[in-house]
């Protein structure tokens, strides 16, 4: 049985590397990404226990310097699915802080990897991590479909009497 740190170092890092991610390059993969968690702007006092920092086990970055996905890691003896909500919260808080969509989350115990496109599909078990290029392409397709949908809705609204 491995602890989470060993699982990350001995299994998850290797699986990311086999998909082409340079786990030693922080412009591609950052471990322990510090995510600020704050209250909504209209809430000024008192300071809440819900404010502070979260640390995503991994953030996978695109060429533009923004995260494409977060990865929540669990030790090998734990069910990877217990990281689902935690990973979603990380993605949601990154999105709030950056103002950019962050729909892709992964959670894994090193052996089982789950992928969740939080905007389009339910979580599903996958065999490995995608390449950086593949993930960036999927994100562009998602963004393109959203822009197309928004444009269509605006045109429909403008055409109504």
Each model region followed by its residue ranges:
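ATP-dependent helicase/translocase motor core
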Residues: 1-161
């Amino acid at each position: 049985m491995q602890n989470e740190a060993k699982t990350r170092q001995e299994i998850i890092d290797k699986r990311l590397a086999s998909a082409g991610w340079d786990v030693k390059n922080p412009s591609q993969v950052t471990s322990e990404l510090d995510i600020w968690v704050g209250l909504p702007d209209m809430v000024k006092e008192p300071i809440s226990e819900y404010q502070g920092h979260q640390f995503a086990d991994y953030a996978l970055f695109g060429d533009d310097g923004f995260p494409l996905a977060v990865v929540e890691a669990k030790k090998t003896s734990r069910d990877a699915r217990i990281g689902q909500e935690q990973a979603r919260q990380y993605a949601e808080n990154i999105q709030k802080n950056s103002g950019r969509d962050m729909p892709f989350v992964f959670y894994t115990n090193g052996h089982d990897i789950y992928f969740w496109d939080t905007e389009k599909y339910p979580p599903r078990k996958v065999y490995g991590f995608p390449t950086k290029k593949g993930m960036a392409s999927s994100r562009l397709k998602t963004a393109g479909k959203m822009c197309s949908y928004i444009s269509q809705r605006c045109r429909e609204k403008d055409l109504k009497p």
